Amino acid sequence: MAWLRLQPLTSAFLHFGLVTFVLFLNGLRAEAGGSGDVPSTGQNNESCSGSSDCKEGVILPIWYPENPSLGDKIARVIVYFVALIYMFLGVSIIADRFMASIEVITSQEREVTIKKPNGETSTTTIRVWNETVSNLTLMALGSSAPEILLSLIEVCGHGFIAGDLGPSTIVGSAAFNMFIIIGICVYVIPDGETRKIKHLRVFFITAAWSIFAYIWLYMILAVFSPGVVQVWEGLLTLFFFPVCVLLAWVADKRLLFYKYMHKKYRTDKHRGIIIETEGDHPKGIEMDGKMMNSHFLDGNLVPLEGKEVDESRREMIRILKDLKQKHPEKDLDQLVEMANYYALSHQQKSRAFYRIQATRMMTGAGNILKKHAAEQAKKASSMSEVHTDEPEDFISKVFFDPCSYQCLENCGAVLLTVVRKGGDMSKTMYVDYKTEDGSANAGADYEFTEGTVVLKPGETQKEFSVGIIDDDIFEEDEHFFVRLSNVRIEEEQPEEGMPPAIFNSLPLPRAVLASPCVATVTILDDDHAGIFTFECDTIHVSESIGVMEVKVLRTSGARGTVIVPFRTVEGTAKGGGEDFEDTYGELEFKNDETVKTIRVKIVDEEEYERQENFFIALGEPKWMERGISALLLSPDVTDRKLTMEEEEAKRIAEMGKPVLGEHPKLEVIIEESYEFKTTVDKLIKKTNLALVVGTHSWRDQFMEAITVSAAGDEDEDESGEERLPSCFDYVMHFLTVFWKVLFACVPPTEYCHGWACFAVSILIIGMLTAIIGDLASHFGCTIGLKDSVTAVVFVAFGTSVPDTFASKAAALQDVYADASIGNVTGSNAVNVFLGIGLAWSVAAIYWALQGQEFHVSAGTLAFSVTLFTIFAFVCISVLLYRRRPHLGGELGGPRGCKLATTWLFVSLWLLYILFATLEAYCYIKGF
């Protein structure tokens, strides 16, 4: 019973080897002339036993002599078999380039304007290609290109005569995908974990079409016109492909009847199979991974693309917050790199990415994500080590620092500072200055001043003063200007003995005026207690500011001590530490003090988009003057009659008392952090997988082709550090280095947005597929296997191995099962509609133009199609049954259920291979 403990994949390979061995012995027996005890089924011996007479291939000729000895035959079988494996490796590697071009093509983005429920609009970028459409067209073509092209090349290369290799490969590949790949995906999920299909509507559509595709094949072969494919049958088969894509897109976008059906699908509760629910639904139930009615907010339609963009931003913000908590010692750049690798590793990936990853890890090209992370780290470290040594600047810059000055009217004089920066500090420099009137007038408010500032060798700054005139007249704040001009350097004389030519060749030191070369001086009146105000009525602050500082200005006077109360007032932003800390208190302005600062703590919520407001309000200022002015302004004085002198004094006191100015209330608008928003946007752009799998130049491709890298898993660590290559990596690299270097000549994916790489790659895949078809046919005829059996067993297996590893990786790494098994059904349907539909349409049209019919043998293919359709019904039914609550999803679940499902699917595949082989050799009767 020890064999029961073998893993399903190992068991599948074991059975595969046994079947191959039996078929090989059968071929040798047939070649040796043994008649055997083959039951009579009404078919001739050649049809039942297969033929050892090899035919000319599309590219490869026949290997002569045609009837070799047993030893030579075994040698030829080994050569053909090894050549097949090597060609399969080559196809996998060029398919890697092909899928990279598809990833780049489907990652193209365009700008859209999204209208929010509140009427605001925002511009963002979304992908041009719909995910469902790309999966059923380019992605399916990329993963199934060898099968599709083999069918087309076989028909066209053999004079438009139907062959068994192409169609049987498509059906055999569909069986391998449906049973073996899904079985492996079910098993590899850790015990107790599950994976569900997210886009269930799309899965229903593609599953239905995949079943219909093979039913349709049977109807063409055995019902409508047995043994003949007419033109309308071929064209209609091909036409089903865009119809399938269109219906899947309608289901994904919820168009037509989906738009009016706020439903989910559900079978009877008593049967327990909860697929989706219909009718009324509780709040928060998901359909296809999206909230029900989530696209209707306040009666307005919000595009689903906008919601997906917002979801991406929220996920990126969550990653940044988590990493910041785990690694508080890291700076922002380090956190960005870590978040980039984490997001790339954990985001939902396309089928193309998993196919590329599987091929590269299998051929010693390494883990794409780890290589990308290592390259980014090296690039960052090299950038930090670059020090640009700028040549010495011979130009000296002269300017005011600072450029704005304030002084009280009674200060006497104001000092201004001139600064020299750069150039030759050993020279003496001169710069002229002159005052200019603004609202303040020379002679009345300040003293007109002009002169020259001398900066001696080694001096970097110099001060000069301008006199301020004081008066007892109450007036507004006034200002004037001071302008620099005519900067020059003292002329230098040549040293004794220095030739004039050498002296004249030396660079002359230069000096220029730099901004700011004009200073503004504001004179504050000191004959008034002051007008208290904010600088403006609205201020925008970033949520990451921490503690914001707001200035309260005292203008039009600064006499006496004044207390100004203040407090924060809630708006849409809430206090109490939710959005900001409640702040209140009093500002005490001393005599001649003109500026005070209010500090308010802002809570950083790290939101991508934020706009909330609160207010800071100033109360009535209180004059702390204890003279006659304060006495006359007190409420007690109003009870008695004032004398003429007191009335005049009170009028003057009223004019000079402190009051609130133009902006007594400040609105503070809290916005998202620009740096944080930019970081999130940058991360979203950097986490585009097209940047990881794509190439930018031929140099990059050749360097990658000759480099050995470690294959490791993404789950090993979060740092993204590369490991050293293993022995297996080196072996696979040297086995495939010829293909890698050859296919490095394919145009990089950056050219023509990936289309150049797409076109060249598909041409190369077609050439290699033609060779594979010839090798497979010659391999089969050498050992006496029929083309239909060779296709179902060998060719289908060889073309599906990369997809197997890709689906396994997708099942383990993705949250949902769409990338691992959701694309299997769609790919199977596309194989029939494109692979068989295109080939048969071309052949049917060709023979129709010749006035003849296109004949296709219905027997073996019709039997295989019928058998696969029955088994596919069983497989899909089991997958839907696994959505019961106690199992939870198509993949994973309890260990016993996993094993049972996997064994069932593997057994279905083995039965399919067995029955198809027995029917081909007439051991059982087909159609």
UniProtKB/Swiss-Prot annotation:
Residues the entry annotates as binding Ca(2+) 4: 445, 471, 475, 478
List of residues binding Ca(2+) 5: 543, 607, 672
Tissue: Isoform 2 is expressed in brain and skeletal muscle. Isoform 3 is expressed in excitable cells of brain, retina and skeletal muscle. Isoform 4 is expressed in skeletal muscle.
Activity regulation summary: Calcium transport is down-regulated by Na(+) and stimulated by Ca(2+).
Reaction catalysed by this enzyme: Ca(2+)(in) + 3 Na(+)(out) = Ca(2+)(out) + 3 Na(+)(in)
Gene3D superfamilies in the cross-refs: 2.60.40.2030, NCX, central ion-binding region
Positions with a binding annotation for Ca(2+) 2: 409, 470-471, 526-527
InterPro entries in alphabetical order: CaCA, CalX-like_sf, Calx_beta, Na_Ca_Ex, Na_Ca_Ex_C-exten, NaCa_Exmemb, NCX_ion-bd_dom_sf
Residues of this chain annotated as glycosylated in UniProt: 45, 823
Region of interest (Putative calmodulin-binding region), residue spans: 253-272
Signal peptide: 1-30
Domain Calx-beta: from-to ranges: 386-485, 519-619
Family in the record: Belongs to the Ca(2+):cation antiporter (CaCA) (TC 2.A.19) family. SLC8 subfamily.
UniProt name for this protein: Sodium/calcium exchanger 3
High-level lineage: Eukaryota, Metazoa, Chordata, Craniata, Vertebrata
